[in-house]
């Protein structure tokens, strides 16, 4: 069992990018789903969809369904240059990082910071426009 699902998601995407895989399977949580929506809106991934795997065929103990998110990564050109250069976890379970409404730019506006606010999970630009702060989850560039 994974304690930090956001770090697990970022690591899976980072590893799939380095291996130049087209698809990556991520465990379903609502936070992971919202982060995928932001990455799609900002153009870092091509698409994503939720997938239900029926585990009852393989396990006689429990008839349970396993929810996952399948992310299709985005590459440019013949050499498959990734749209995602790096993914960094900012706020960790042992060290939470919060910011007021004056969130700094990421690489002069080239990257984004994903922020968890009282109005939901959003990018740093949206949080600055709405003048609300929150927990800095991760940065993507």
Curated annotation (Swiss-Prot):
GO terms for cellular component: chloroplast; ribonucleoprotein complex; ribosome. Its main location: plastid. It is found in: Plastid, Chloroplast. One of its GO terms (biological process) is translation. SUPFAM superfamilies: Ribosomal protein S8. Keywords: Chloroplast, Plastid, Ribonucleoprotein, Ribosomal protein, RNA-binding, rRNA-binding. InterPro entries: Ribosomal_uS8, Ribosomal_uS8_CS, Ribosomal_uS8_sf. It holds the Pfam family Ribosomal_S8. The keyword rRNA-binding applies. It comes from the Eukaryota. GO terms for molecular function: rRNA binding; structural constituent of ribosome. Part of the 30S ribosomal subunit. Belongs to the universal ribosomal protein uS8 family. One of the primary rRNA binding proteins, it binds directly to 16S rRNA central domain where it helps coordinate assembly of the platform of the 30S subunit. This is Small ribosomal subunit protein uS8c. It comes from Pleurastrum terricola (Filamentous green alga).
